[in-house]
Design a protein with these regions (language model features):
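Glycine-rich phosphate-binding loops that contact phosphosugars or nucleotide phosphates
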Residues: 289-438, 518-525
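Short gly/pro/ser/thr-enriched loop/turn and capping motifs at secondary-structure boundaries
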Residues: 117, 124-128, 178-180, 198-199, ...
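Short, solvent-exposed amphipathic alpha-helical segments in soluble enzyme
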Residues: 20-24, 85, 113, 174-177, ...
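Active-site phosphate/pyrophosphate-binding segments
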Residues: 261-265, 269-295, 364, 385-516, ...
Length: 525
């Protein structure tokens, strides 16, 4: 997932852009680059690999300028090379881009027939030449951008700077998030893929809506909707700060976030209960007794949280629950019951497939509930109810604290549903919530055994294949454990329902395959 930063200021922006890109490293990337307007023309610096490589190049070849854009790229169209890295530059513009332009081949052929010369294999360069083509027709930067946006098909966010316009920075979004930042210095304005990239610069953020494009000038943002009508977008004051995003005493962000779990689970739980520790959610715009089914849509780790929630809704609320991978659900055209609830789970609140699934569910008349870590996100804005996880910024690529806070919210929601439907007694609900209140201290107890966990990890690290097994509620945990091992160690791992081991997986097990069984003391073990 790529990252965008754009800055318009009165000071040199290259160091600020580089710092913003470092804050977007968690999104994953294989190359990075910057472009600024220098003495009336555009200069750029790009590098393969780590941002440190780009920083080294900037030390050798400094990049002045008071307006600029930066990008971290994860290759989709074209190999991860310096030539394919962003920004892409013509004699009139520089462009950075997240997402995919689906009709770039047709546009590229059209532009090549007009003698536009392409240097890269990317779809992004097509945007730069398309805007340039409209500029060559004597359009203004704003007119050229609006015209180009109408030709582009796909999901994307872009940022553009223009030769001869040192006080102009344009951004646009369609299916990919883009935030506008307002500087403490009234003359500074910012663009970012998310608020994290802008955290050290400002806490005043507005989020572009689907189809919006924005023109930034000193101290001013003019937002246009998809019909090019000027609109207002609310400015939010975020709680993020540069200090919150540091690694502190930890070697890497994921380890830091693992150790933050007790605190953030406690904070999330405190937001969902009253003074007696009982679930106390805000009024919901539906009656649980009239809900025929809950449809949970999510991706990756959030999907596994949804699988756990399915068990809770069925067992605690006696309510039918369906869980779907959002990337599959959005294309299935599944029938949805009248009066149903669609529940979206997403750390960022910007997961494109989950957002598309919710648009479908909303069109089917479902009430939308969002469990997200970013209350101002696109998914949150689309929803009827937002139940935030208070995990704080999650920088590590592999989700940890967001997952456990999602489970906290989902359990409280299922308990609330069970009580409302009259199928869960107050006594049992109190007992469940007492157990939940003990979770932070239990996690602390496990984390104190870090040395033993490291010893076990050394044994697993030598394996080529690992099997995770669980039953009931813990089957989704087995799936999540296998996903984490794959993400972090690149060791092949699979999660299975324990009862299914004899139906295939057992044939692959020998003395070299570790089997990790999640086996608590319950009715199944």
């Amino acid at each position: 997932m790529c990252g965008i930063v754009g800055i318009l200021a009165e000071r040199q922006v290259a160091p600020l852009l580089l710092d913003g890109l470092r804050r977007l490293e968690y999104r994953g990337y294989d190359s990075a680059g910057l472009a600024t307007l220098v003495n009336g023309h555009i200069e750029n610096r790009r590098a393969e690999g780590k941002i440190d490589n780009l920083a080294s190049r900037l030390e050798r070849e400094p990049l002045p300028g008071t307006v600029g854009i930066g990008h971290t790229r994860w290759a989709t169209h074209g190999r991860p090379t310096e030539t394919n890295a962003h920004p892409h530059v013509t004699d009139k513009v520089a462009v950075v881009h997240n997402g995919i332009i689906e009709n770039y081949r047709e546009l590229r052929r059209e532009l090549e027939e007009k003698q536009h010369r392409f240097q890269s294999e990317t779809d992004t360069e097509t945007i730069a030449h398309l805007i340039t083509d409209y500029l060559n027709q004597n359009m203004s930067p704003q007119e050229a951008t609006a015209a180009a946006l109408k030709r582009l098909e796909g999901a994307f966010a872009i940022a553009v700077i223009f030769v001869g316009h040192k006080n102009l920075l344009i951004g646009a979004r369609r299916g990919s998030p883009l935030a506008v930042g307002y500087g403490a210095n009234d003359n500074e304005m910012y663009l970012g893929s998310d608020a994290l990239a802008l955290a050290p610069l400002t806490n005043r953020i507005s989020y572009l809506e689907e189809g919006d494009w924005v023109e930034l000038s000193p101290g001013k943002a003019i937002v246009h909707n998809a019909s090019d009508v000027v609109v207002e977008r609310k400015i939010h004051v975020t709680a993020l700060s540069g200090a919150m995003i540091g690694k502190g005493q930890y070697r890497h962000f994921m380890l830091k976030e693992i150790f933050e779990q007790p605190a953030v689970i406690g904070e999330t739980l405190a937001s969902l209960v009253d003074g007696q520790g009982r679930v106390a959610l805000n009024d919901l715009p539906f009656d649980w007794n009239s809900v025929p089914r809950v449809t949970i849509v999510a991706c990756g780790t959030a999907y596994y949280a949804g699988l756990v929630a399915k068990y809770w809704f069925e067992q605690l609320a006696r309510l039918s629950a369906e869980v779907d991978v959002a990337s599959e659900f959005r294309y299935r055209e599944a029938p949805m019951p009248e009066g149903g609830v669609a529940l979206a789970v997403s750390q960022s609140g910007e997961t494109a497939d989950t957002l598309a699934a919710l648009h479908y569910a909303k069109a089917q008349g479902q009430k939308i509930v969002a469990v997200v870590n970013v209350p101002q996100s696109s998914i949150a804005r689309l929803s009827d109810v937002v139940l935030p996880t208070l995990a704080g910024p999650e920088i590590g690529v592999a989700s940890t604290k967001a997952y456990t806070t999602q489970l906290t919210v989902l359990l409280c929601l299922a308990v609330s549903a069970g009580l409302a439907r009259g199928v869960l007694s107050a006594e049992r609900a109190d007992a469940i919530m007492q157990c939940v209140r003990e979770v932070p201290s239990m996690i602390n107890h496990v984390l104190r055994d870090e040395h033993h966990i490291q010893e076990l990890a050394h044994h697993v690290a030598e394996a080529r294949d690992v099997l995770y097994l669980g039953r009931g509620l813990l089957y989704p945990l087995a799936l999540e454990g296998a996903l984490k091992l794959k993400e972090i160690s690149y060791i092949h791992a699979e999660g299975y329902a324990a009862g299914e081991m004899k139906h295939g997986p057992i044939a692959l097990i020998d003395e070299r395959v570790p089997v990790i069984v999640i086996a608590p003391s319950d009715g199944l073990f």
